[in-house]
């Protein structure tokens, strides 16, 4: 046999051997493992923890000059976009998975983004094969079905967006009292401002101002989020400083820029002069009018402020005629361009903190001086990763809640959508795509107390 022929045969043998090794190294986890254990194994073998954590598992070549610089860029980018520590912890402890983590994982699988080629070429066992992808996608669907007790059409059971519930369980007596307190201006220092002043129920749960006016005309530094469907948020306020609706209700009355009361003792002293109100409290709360009881009643009322039966909810439940073809195309674009990796669940948001300017520096382009409010979650944690990171706003009734963003700088949905594409998704939407996504967002306006929500303010 000629030398060249021997070389060719040897080369083919080596290639065949490498192919076998590659297939073995990239085989899917055993189906004898629990579903969560299979997913955990795929994540670990895929090298997810090499980038998506604050304590990455670095390969040996990370110490080399050029390779080390490349790896650092990848780690910084990966960790900014997705911290996988919570999802790994949840899998290891058989806990519920955050819906945003599910959505991000699903999108990565659909787009076959991870791991990047430069990683799996050096780590043969990290490739995401079709078998691994199927395991992940089935797990995402099963987790969503477990997470949400809703009724979706069978072919929509795995959608990242869910319908608003028809009702929530509340203590009706507390809710009625909370409704009264929500509109009571005595919670403010000079009896001029109530919760409804900035979160009007007849104006989409907001005031449609860039910054709300408090006592003496003082302006806040952040755009007022809607009160509708706030019960679905995992925390309250843009910076997440309130864990519950009751915690949130305790903030504005004592905020010197908002309602400016000196203390709840001052508020209680005023309310105790109202004999009917004292009686109402005593009938519900044995200890009468207290700070905790005031905020508890407001919380119970705000739990009733849900807006079910939006056209898109009807579509999710199986009514194909509930939305237009244009709106459906918009929803598909909404998913294609990663919007549905953060705007998930019944409220299409409110489930995570995300970086404003993930793909392009928003604040550098904005042309306004940075404020303390622009620091977002960093205000509370003082962790650098949280700078410019905000609670994702819910998109329910978004057509009624202009202006947009935490700084209220976008007056229309068209502006907000186009710029989200640039700064969060890294895409430039054309006019038709923008129009379609806006059409989808318009299908998210729901009903309150049996009537379609409207806004008395005119844009």
Predicted regions and their residues:
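Post-cleavage N-terminal segment of exported redox proteins
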Residues: 1-35, 112-176, 260-328, 332, ...
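Short extracytoplasmic/periplasmic juxtamembrane "stem" segments immediately C-terminal to an N-terminal membrane anchor
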Residues: 33-47
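Extracytoplasmic/secreted envelope proteins and their assembly/folding machinery
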Residues: 40, 68, 72, 102, ...
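Short glycine/threonine-rich turn/loop motifs
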Residues: 41, 56-86, 156-251, 315-418, ...
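Sec/Tat-exported extracytoplasmic proteins
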Residues: 47, 52-55, 75, 109-113, ...
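Axial heme c-ligation environment in periplasmic c-type cytochrome domains
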Residues: 57-61, 81-95, 99-102, 107-132, ...
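Alpha-helix N-cap/helix-start motif at coil-to-helix transitions, marked by capping-box chemistry
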Residues: 65, 103, 108, 243, ...
């Amino acid at each position: 046999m000629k030398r060249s022929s021997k070389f060719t045969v040897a080369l083919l043998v080596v290639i065949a051997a490498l192919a076998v090794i590659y297939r073995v190294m990239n085989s899917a986890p055993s189906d004898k493992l629990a579903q969560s254990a299979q997913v955990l194994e795929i994540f670990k073998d895929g090298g997810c923890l090499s980038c998506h954590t604050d304590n990455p598992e670095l390969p040996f070549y990370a110490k080399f000059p050029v390779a080390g610089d490349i790896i650092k860029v990848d780690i910084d980018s990966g960790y900014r976009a997705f911290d996988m520590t919570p999802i790994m912890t949840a899998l290891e402890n058989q806990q519920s998975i955050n819906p945003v983590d599910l959505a991000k994982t699903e999108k990565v699988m659909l787009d076959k983004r991870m791991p990047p080629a430069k990683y799996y070429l050096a780590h043969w066992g990290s490739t995401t094969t079709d078998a691994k992808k199927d395991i992940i996608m089935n797990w995402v669907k099963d987790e969503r079905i477990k997470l949400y007790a809703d009724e979706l059409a069978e072919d929509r059971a795995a959608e990242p967006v869910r319908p608003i519930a028809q009702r929530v369980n509340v203590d009706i007596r507390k809710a009625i009292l909370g409704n009264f307190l929500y509109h009571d201006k005595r919670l403010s220092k000079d009896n001029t401002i109530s919760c409804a002043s900035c979160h009007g129920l007849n104006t989409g749960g907001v005031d449609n101002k860039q910054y709300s006016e408090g006592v003496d005309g003082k302006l806040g530094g952040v755009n007022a989020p809607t009160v509708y469907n706030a019960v679905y948020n995992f925390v309250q306020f843009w910076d997440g400083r309130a864990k519950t609706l009751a915690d949130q209700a305790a903030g504005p009355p004592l905020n010197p820029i908002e309602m400016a009361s000196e203390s709840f003792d001052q508020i209680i002293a005023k309310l105790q002069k109202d004999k009917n109100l004292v009686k109402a409290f005593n009938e519900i709360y044995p200890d009468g009018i207290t700070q905790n009881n005031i905020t508890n009643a407001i919380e119970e009322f705000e739990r009733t402020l849900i807006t079910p039966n939006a056209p898109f909810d009807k579509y999710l439940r199986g009514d194909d005629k509930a939305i237009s073809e244009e709106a459906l195309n918009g929803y598909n674009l909404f998913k294609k361009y990663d919007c549905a990796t953060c705007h998930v669940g019944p409220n299409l948001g409110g489930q995570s903190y995300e970086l404003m300017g993930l793909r392009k520096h928003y604040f550098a382009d904005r042309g306004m001086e940075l404020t303390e409010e622009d620091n977002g979650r960093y205000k509370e944690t003082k962790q650098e990763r949280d700078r410019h990171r905000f609670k994702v706003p819910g998109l329910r009734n978004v057509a009624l809640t202009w202006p947009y963003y935490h700084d209220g700088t976008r007056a229309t949905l068209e502006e907000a959508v186009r710029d989200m594409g640039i700064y969060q998704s890294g895409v430039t939407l054309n006019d038709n795509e923008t129009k379609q996504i806006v059409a989808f967002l318009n299908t998210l306006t729901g009903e309150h107390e049996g009537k379609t929500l409207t806004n008395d303010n005119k844009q």
